[in-house]
Amino acid sequence: MAIIEASNRAYLLAYQRNARLMRLLEQVAAIDDNVRELRLRRGRTFVERNARSIRDLQARGIADPDVDPLLAATALSAMVGRMAYTTYVIGEESDLEQLVTTLTRLWANALRIPDDALQVQEK
């Protein structure tokens, strides 16, 4: 869980630092095909990395083997990205630590990672 938590925290902090740029990219991507394609490629990079991590967790018997890794990575990445957008661009106030904790728990729950498996792996 520490890796998921650290990844979520790093993403949220980077998004927070770059909120104005992220807002602009979102707006321009809606009207410019080149920018939209750039954002899609950037997003795919994160999704593919997350899918590899999910496959690894499945291979180690930690995550639900019946979950499609690529689809799960796409959905979970979208969840974190949209929360970052809602918080730092739209301005829906949320405490960083509460965001990190909640998003990390949702990740673990979605992959049906038991708490005890995470504690054993982190030691």
Task: Outline where the language-model segments fall.
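Amphipathic alpha-helical packing segments from all-alpha helical-bundle domains
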Residues: 13-17, 23, 33-59, 70-74, ...
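Short, hydrophobic secondary-structure boundary micro-motifs
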Residues: 22-25, 37-38, 66, 119-120
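Transmembrane helix-loop junctions in multipass membrane proteins, especially transporters and channels
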Residues: 90-94
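C-terminal effector-binding regulatory domain of bacterial HTH transcription factors
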Residues: 113-123
